[in-house]
Amino acid sequence: MNAIDRPVRFGSVEIESPLILAPMAGVCDLPYRMIARKHGAALVCAEMVSAKGLVYGNKHTREMLTVHKNEHPLSMQLFGAEPEIMARAAKVAQEYGADIIDINMGCPVRKVVQNGEGSALMKNLPLAEKVVSAVVKAVSVPVTVKMRTGWDDSEFVAPELARRCEAAGAAALAVHGRTREQFYSGRADLEKIAAVVKAVSIPVIGNGDITDGPSCARMFEETGCTAVMIGRGAQGNPWIFEEVRDYLSGRTVQKPSAADRYAVLLEHFEGLIRFKGAHIALREMRSHASWYTKGLFGSAALRERINRTSTVEEFRQVISGVAKCTV
């Protein structure tokens, strides 16, 4: 059996393969999660949500927890730094249908870390452990943690944080091989992910710079991780899960055609209309469209046309018109 043709278990939840869609703000909306599942993601993660927003009934935050019956298993990621609030939010997320609760200890964005949340928790390991413990005690579903290798290069805290998370009851850990200070610059450090794998007995999910079959193979081979989590490599590219699966299984890798890309772009757009309404769908689809069309002939001019559309029908006509020219 190769690295891909096997189920993976996180606590009580088993997924059919070790391929996971990372939680990404502005990317992992419900329609895209459904598309990723269809193209081979064994576990999808919703966009991170504020624990305080959930607990205090923020309408927009709760709307982000809308779940479709066909996307399970689903992980919902929470960010926050107050154990009691995180525990209460986890209960809400479970009630909304989360199969796994993920705790964000990796977000590098300033407005998150300035509140001591996200990757700032890596600078306060006792508090991080308390957050995990509180969430584990509050819910009956598995709890996972997503982290980075540390705040900066001055201290490699991930192994110790991983041990503390395991002691607090975490079922698995996802490790992005960069520090907070790196954001997304440089390369993911696979040696540091491997060190976390050796530090704990629970599954470790490798994350960072997986963009195709060979890079996924390197992640498995050089880290010994149990599963992989694909983030930016999946932006506008749900086919990456099929590509990775085929590559690691020794099958011929089939790249999506331009027609395939336009068809899924429209599928995503129609899903956003149903999920969020026409106005929001038009606005949000501009970012998605730039990812779907990246590298295609005439994509820069197409993006300009897309950005000028003001109605659903205009958007459909622009994409449909370009798609016809690819046939």
Features from the language model and the residues they span:
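Alpha/beta enzyme core
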Residues: K38, A87-E117, L125-I202, R218, ...
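Glycine-rich, positively charged N-terminal anion/phosphate-binding segment
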Residues: N2-R9, M24-D99
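Active-site beta-loop-alpha junctions enriched in small/polar residues
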Residues: M24, V49-A51, F79-A81, G106-P108, ...
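N-terminal small/glycine-rich loop or linker at the start of catalytic domains
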Residues: V8-I20, L54-L74, C107, K111-N115, ...
